Amino acid sequence: MSQKAIKGYINLIIPAAGATPAPPIGPALGQRKVNIAAFCKDFNDATQAMEKGIPLPTVITVYEDRSFSFKIKTSPASYFLKKYAKITKGSSATKKEAVVGKVTMDDCREIAKLKMPDLNTKNIEAATKIICGSAASMGLEVVGN
C-alpha cells in the first residue's frame, strides 16, 4: 500500500467546534484547493465534545489528490494560564515590572500534565518548569513550592 503524496501543511489555531469557511480557514484551505465545507464539518465533529471556543492548534496535511487529514494539538499554555489566573490577557510590560495575576505551582503542574503530549519532555518536573517560564513571561507570579 503506497502513501499519498503530501502537497503541504497548514498550521492554524481554530476554536473548538467553531470551524467556519470564513478567514483564516477558508482562504488557507482554498489556496490548496481543499474542500472547505468537508474540513469544517470533520473538524467540528471531532471537537464537538470539547469546551466550545477553546483555541486548538491544528496541523492540516494536504495531499496531492486534494484530500486532507488533520491533527489537533492541546491548547496553548497561555490559554490555560489565563484561565487559571482569571485574567483576559498577559502583561504588556516585562516580567519584573508588572504582575497581572498569580498562579500556584499546583496549577502549573496540572497544566503541564495536560500539555505533556505536545511538550519536548517526558519528565513532569521539567514540564512544570516550562509552564512556570511561560507564566513568568506573561507577567504571572508563580506562588507555592
Swiss-Prot record:
The gene is rplK. GO terms for biological process: translation. Part of the ribosomal stalk of the 50S ribosomal subunit. Interacts with L10 and the large rRNA to form the base of the stalk. L10 forms an elongated spine to which L12 dimers bind in a sequential fashion forming a multimeric L10(L12)X complex. Keywords: Methylation, Ribonucleoprotein, Ribosomal protein, RNA-binding, rRNA-binding. Forms part of the ribosomal stalk which helps the ribosome interact with GTP-bound translation factors. One of its GO terms (molecular function) is large ribosomal subunit rRNA binding. It comes from the Bacteria. One or more lysine residues are methylated. PANTHER family: 60S RIBOSOMAL PROTEIN L12, LARGE RIBOSOMAL SUBUNIT PROTEIN UL11M. Belongs to the universal ribosomal protein uL11 family. SUPFAM superfamilies: Ribosomal L11/L12e N-terminal domain, Ribosomal protein L11, C-terminal domain. GO terms for cellular component: cytosolic large ribosomal subunit. The lineage of its organism: Bacteria, Pseudomonadati, Pseudomonadota, Alphaproteobacteria, Rickettsiales. This is Large ribosomal subunit protein uL11. It holds the Pfam family Ribosomal_L11.
